[in-house]
């Protein structure tokens, strides 16, 4: 009986997702961090500000439940695998 109970506990732990394991790179530190539950997309936004000619485009990386909406003069890409939004 104890063996059956232990087996059921192990199977339950294996089958349940006890934590969100999906991760994306996030700014400002450009390091991989876990996403919140329900956020299963990684995104990269890039755009030019007034310093673009000196230091290049501004980059924003993060997690999202849906791909962020298009914005004028901003490039937005989304992907759905762990850490797929590497810094361009």
UniProtKB/Swiss-Prot annotation:
Keywords annotated in UniProt: Acetylcholine receptor inhibiting toxin, Disulfide bond, Ion channel impairing toxin, Neurotoxin, Postsynaptic neurotoxin, Secreted, Signal, Toxin
GO molecular function terms attached to this record: acetylcholine receptor inhibitor activity; ion channel regulator activity; toxin activity
UniProt KW Signal keyword: yes
Gene3D superfamilies referenced in this protein's UniProt entry, alphabetically: CD59
Signal peptide coordinates: 1-21
Domain of life: Eukaryota
InterPro entries, A to Z: Snake_3FTx (IPR003571), Snake_toxin-like_sf (IPR045860), Snake_toxin_con_site (IPR018354), Toxin_cobra-type (IPR054131)
Cysteines paired by S-S bonds: 24-42, 35-63, 48-52, 67-78, 79-84
Tissue expression profile of the protein: Expressed by the venom gland.
Recorded GO CC terms: extracellular region
Subcellular location: Secreted
Family assignment from sequence similarity: Belongs to the three-finger toxin family. Long-chain subfamily. Type II alpha-neurotoxin sub-subfamily.
Function: Binds with high affinity to muscular (alpha-1/CHRNA1) and neuronal (alpha-7/CHRNA7) nicotinic acetylcholine receptor (nAChR) and inhibits acetylcholine from binding to the receptor, thereby impairing neuromuscular and neuronal transmission.
Protein name: Long neurotoxin 20
Lineage of source species: Eukaryota, Metazoa, Chordata, Craniata, Vertebrata
